[in-house]
């Protein structure tokens, strides 16, 4: 199985490698045949490629069996004409996904909003 790892912005480069490390540990223990490839998105990509979500990232996401995508700072990106693509939106439209689902659970004793 191929996973594409995209660290993103802000806390992403700190937390996404931890998730990738967890997959690598599972792979070693269970022999799942997982391979990971990292592609920069967000400000790191803007600096190197002039775009916050390069076409290469979408192509690799299409070819992968799964993706790990860190948070992105879309509101701070430059205008689209200046390379400021919103990675989440481009992933959803480029992979024909219908929603950006964020699972959540409520816990007893903890008030919900």
Regions found by a protein language model. Give the residues of each.
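N-terminal basic/disordered segments at the start of proteins
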Residues: 6-21
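Short catalytic helix/loop segments, enriched in acidic residues and glycine
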Residues: 20-30
